[in-house]
């Protein structure tokens, strides 16, 4: 994933898009929509709960390995590469069972110091 992304939709629209029941939306944990969401901030995610239902809730944007005693590590863990995540110690366990959908309106990639915003042609929700 990139280092910055945007979500300009309201959470009701996100819940509807991903078939999350109203009772399974934790509004109190969800951040305000933003066009500058950065690592270590609170983000919204859709994930399957232990009850087998989809839940929309807030989450810390990074990956904290189970063996870590702190959220703050000496190296960033928010940007796993799909081609190597299954073999890196920090990501291995999570790639097997901890999946989530991260809804976004778009994301930013930089060329030098200039950000470029990527989004769907008609601003449909990305995930």
Sequence positions of predicted segments:
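Short linear sequence motif anchored by a di-proline
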Residues: 1-127
């Amino acid at each position: 994933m990139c280092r910055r992304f945007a979500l300009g939709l309201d959470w009701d629209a996100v819940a509807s898009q991903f078939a999350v029941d109203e009772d399974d939306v934790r509004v109190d944990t969800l951040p305000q929509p933003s066009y500058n969401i950065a690592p270590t901030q609170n983000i919204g995610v859709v994930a399957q709960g232990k009850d087998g239902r989809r839940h929309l809730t807030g989450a810390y944007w990074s990956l904290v390995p189970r063996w870590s005693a702190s959220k703050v590590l000496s190296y960033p863990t928010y940007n796993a590469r799909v081609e190597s995540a299954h073999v890196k110690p920090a990501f291995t366990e999570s790639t097997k069972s901890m999946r989530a959908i991260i809804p976004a309106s778009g994301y930013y990639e930089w060329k030098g110091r200039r950000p470029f915003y990527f989004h769907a042609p008609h601003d449909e929700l990305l995930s």
